[in-house]
């Protein structure tokens, strides 16, 4: 089991004023206390590298966290097959390609918690995997 961060969860770590920053940090601290990996798909990083200032902040964050149980999971053929399988099982188009990366990183570990700002799409992708929990970064709004 591992904690997996999607792009918005990583963005929260880059901005101390982000509403989910504290929630993500607490989850990372809990994972470390339990000696669990914190995973980020490198495909997720592609969503975040958006210019010099942001790139530097992201690289600094990754450097700070790298020695402390952080797993940067590259997309090799094995992960690519898993991502393709997730999309196929969910009857999803390539529009969910980026969302499939963090789910795949959790699935390959045998399960985990994925923190995300997009719980509906990730829950759709993770539906066949009972050991993957999708944790929304923001509380759900009540529907009327």
Predicted regions and their residues:
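Alpha-helix capping/helix-boundary segments
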Residues: 9, 44, 79, 101-102, ...
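Short active-site oxyanion
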Residues: 33-38, 68-71, 108-113
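Short, flexible loop segments at the rims of nucleotide/cofactor-binding pockets, characterized by
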Residues: 15-17, 90-94
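Short, well-structured N-terminal submotif of metal-dependent ribonuclease cores
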Residues: 1-39, 50-64, 129, 140-144
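Phosphate- and divalent-cation-binding pockets in alpha/beta enzyme and binding domains
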Residues: 47-48, 82, 124-125
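Acidic, PIN/NYN-like endoribonuclease modules and their adjacent C-terminal/linker elements
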Residues: 103, 109-144
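Acidic catalytic patch
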Residues: 68-91
